[in-house]
Amino acid sequence: MAAVAAEAAATAASPGEGGAGEAEPEMEPIPGSEAGTDPLPVTATEASVPDGETDGQQSAPQADEPPLPPPPPPPGELARSPEAVGPELEAEEKLSVRVAESAAAAPQGGPELPPSPASPPEQPPAPEEREEPPLPQPVAPALVPPAGGDSTVSQLIPGSEVRVTLDHIIEDALVVSFRFGEKLFSGVLMDLSKRFGPHGIPVTVFPKREYKDKPEAMPLQSNTFQEGTEVKCEANGAVPDDPSPVPHPELSLAESLWTSKPPPLFHEGAPYPPPLFIRDTYNQSIPQPPPRKIKRPKRKMYREEPTSIMNAIKLRPRQVLCDKCKNSVVAEKKEIRKGSSATDSSKYEDKKRRNESVTTVNKKLKTDHKVDGKNQNESQKRNAVVKVSNIAHSRGRVVKVSAQANTSKAQLSTKKVLQSKNMDHAKAREVLKIAKEKAQKKQNETSTSKNAHSKVHFTRRYQNPSSGSLPPRVRLKPQRYRNEENDSSLKTGLEKMRSGKMAPKPQSRCTSTRSAGEAPSENQSPSKGPEEASSEVQDTNEVHVPGDQDEPQTLGKKGSKNNISVYMTLNQKKSDSSSASVCSIDSTDDLKSSNSECSSSESFDFPPGSMHAPSTSSTSSSSKEEKKLSNSLKMKVFSKNVSKCVTPDGRTICVGDIVWAKIYGFPWWPARILTITVSRKDNGLLVRQEARISWFGSPTTSFLALSQLSPFLENFQSRFNKKRKGLYRKAITEAAKAAKQLTPEVRALLTQFET
């Protein structure tokens, strides 16, 4: 032990020769080295290493001391140091001696005490080798097991210096081998001065890390790191006086760097290191912040909607209108363009009437009352449902109901509509004459029109050659609720018109179900008896409508067939009273022989086609009359579903045919005919030919006229649009397959039975 203390003192006495002074250039590229590392524990642990192995490491510092040698090499260069001092004679002699000693010491396994790394040059190596063997003998027997045993490696102590053989020299790396007993170890020593190491081993030299806050972590170390630590200790040359075998805490911290678990790959709050530094340290566990989230723009789904739902919705047009509705819409649009002078007061009044009435109004029917005296140029229009014409003095009104409207469900209230003053018999004759002329014209027009049917709601006014101003337009609407509510709504509407200083207008509510007994008490004033009113009516009928006076039922029958009723008000010269009477005139060819007389004892509000006496006051009887009238009116146009039909242009269309069809806003689209409906009037005149079709590629169906359909295969070249893709092509493909399957035999089977 005295020799060990002497060596330690000598090492401390010469730090400037082979120690710190020579290590200054080497410390610059290794900023992670710790200055002042105590090499004493290394010296204390070297006692258990065999002699031949420790001498190899000891010779390098001694050989480098006499001249001004380069700084001590890194761990890999310790084995190369004998070659570096080859020109020196003393180093060669020592190398040969060590080789011989190592060969003799390997089988013996005798321990020796290696000298200090920074031994003074004055001390010759021969006395050290003679003095060292007896010193560590008390410790060696406990540490050295039999040579070649399984626990041979356990003799090595971390921090001890061993002698390795340099096999290959590669750029920035050394391949070395170490023989210990019967075992041979080989490895590669990497140059850590260039800031990279083997894969998976953290770089501890650069950058410098602070581990002083973790002194408790001290696991075992690897040889490579310890060799580098020994180099640092030699460079520093600082050896404390305390020869205790306890390692220095700073050395223990350095040892814990290698054997402790590597730090996690990401640390919360860790700064991003410079990019170049990361580039030089691939696959190293350098503290990194958590990875950033990569913002990827969401892919917009343009053409990836489900085809079954979206395409079906796209195929539906904005307004699916049949021929009937199209005609009415076109007529309304034309009338709106020309007759745009409807006052706001009339519209407001119309809305109030709708709100007050309990009856549910059909949405397709719109009441549009307009003030008299405006837009006289509208007299050139046709197809009036209800016509109210002014006589020269704007006192009397004539209401004409068209044959195309279901007047069995729409009876005008005469007690409200037909009230004016100072109407003489001559004016009454003029009224009847005008009514007959209009009825004849209307009958001729409707017989020649092809699209005339009972469901069309006409909105254009009829021409009135003798009127000074145009009358308001009246809509007929079906009666669906009780008559008392309708009466109240009519009364309020009339009072509002009177308060607004406007001429009385015909009401748009249906009063066919009113009790017949209400009219006399409301329409006749107490001062005017029924005899006077009846006499006035009789005078009018004698001049213009000759016929019997006792045929109210015959009158009702004729009216039920043709449904033309004329309501006229015959006002007396007295201003304080008025009486109303109703005369029904049919519009058939035998119009001149029709009966229109109304007796004074009868009600003035009976339906024109009533089969019962007008004096009946029960609501049930009037409702029965309405049902009979509606049944008789429905027979005017006969509709039948057929399986085969010939169009006016000579084409034969059958049920199941594949056709091209067109709807406004969409291209020509393939469709299949489901049903064919042919409507004719009672005289055999063709009204319409309509087909219900189903669209290919869509679950929707439509009603279209046969004139708007064209055969699929015959018109394929002219109808097919090559530019369209997607569902259009799919529908075309389905239609083509269906058309190929529709052979003449299949058509014959489909059309052999009439439905």
From Swiss-Prot:
Assembly and oligomerization: Component of a MTA1-specific subcomplex of the NuRD complex (M1HR), composed of PWWP2A, MTA1/2, HDAC1/2, and RBBP4/7 but does not contain CHD4 and MBD3. Interacts with MTA1; the interaction mediates the association of PWWP2A with the M1HR complex. Interacts with H2A.Z/H2AZ1. Interacts (via PWWP domain) with histone H3 trimethylated at 'Lys-36' (H3K36me3). Does not interact with CHD4 and MBD3.
Region spans: Interaction with HDAC1 and MTA1: 148-373
Biased composition (Basic residues): 292-301
Comp. bias regions, Low complexity: 1-15, 593-603
Function comment: Chromatin-binding protein that acts as an adapter between distinct nucleosome components (H3K36me3 or H2A.Z) and chromatin-modifying complexes, contributing to the regulation of the levels of histone acetylation at actively transcribed genes. Competes with CHD4 and MBD3 for interaction with MTA1 to form a NuRD subcomplex, preventing the formation of full NuRD complex (containing CHD4 and MBD3), leading to recruitment of HDACs to gene promoters resulting in turn in the deacetylation of nearby H3K27 and H2A.Z.
Keywords: Isopeptide bond, Nucleus, Phosphoprotein, Transcription, Transcription regulation, Ubl conjugation
Record protein name field: PWWP domain-containing protein 2A
Stretches for region Disordered: 1-153, 282-301, 334-384, 400-562, 578-626
SUPFAM superfamilies assigned: Tudor/PWWP/MBT
Basic and acidic residues composition bias: residue spans: 346-356, 368-381, 422-444
GO biological process, one term: chromatin remodeling
Comp. bias (Pro residues): 64-76, 112-126
Cross-link (Glycyl lysine isopeptide (Lys-Gly) (interchain with G-Cter in SUMO2)): 208
The PWWP domain, residue ranges: 655-715
